[in-house]
């Protein structure tokens, strides 16, 4: 009787995972940022770091699997004039890290804890609109990337 019960339990539980999707097979960004794939360009761990006035610094990295230099267009949606082009050579390009390519969009009005709509495109490839997380420098790891605010404009009195 004991062997029969043990066999029944073993067979009854042996197939538990058959109908359940394995979590390790799902692709996801295992970081705070997001990933974007457009043609030969693969953006990894893209996120925005902001300061107290809402300026936006884009950080992350781009892998160019192609053999030619490309211009990547990054546009922060919902703001006027907040777009830039970034030169991406074959191989790895860091964005906003170690002064390789500082990318700051001043006056963006982004808020930490929210997502910013960012359109990314290059060459003749279709672009993608993605939601990029916005963080501030409260976490020590991101503090060095907080953009410096522009100095106040100088006005001359005649």
Model-derived regions: residue spans:
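C-terminal motif of bacterial Sec signal peptides marking the signal peptidase cleavage site
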Residues: 11-15
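Short, surface-exposed binding/anchoring microloops in extracellular/periplasmic proteins
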Residues: 47-71
């Amino acid at each position: 009787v004991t062997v029969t019960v043990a066999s029944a339990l073993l067979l009854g539980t042996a197939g538990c995972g058959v109908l359940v999707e394995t979590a390790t097979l799902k692709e996801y960004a295992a970081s705070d940022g997001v990933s974007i794939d457009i043609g030969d360009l693969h953006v990894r761990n893209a996120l925005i770091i902001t300061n107290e006035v809402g300026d936006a610094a884009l950080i992350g990295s781009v892998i160019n699997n192609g053999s030619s230099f490309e211009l990547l267009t990054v546009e922060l949606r919902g703001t006027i004039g907040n777009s830039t082009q970034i030169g991406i050579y074959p191989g790895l390009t860091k964005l906003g890290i170690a002064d390789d390519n500082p990318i700051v969009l001043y006056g963006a009005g982004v808020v930490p804890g929210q997502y910013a709509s960012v359109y990314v495109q290059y060459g003749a490839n279709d672009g993608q609109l993605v939601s990029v997380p916005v963080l501030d420098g409260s976490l020590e790891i991101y503090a060095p990337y907080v953009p410096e605010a522009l100095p106040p404009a100088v006005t001359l009195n005649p």
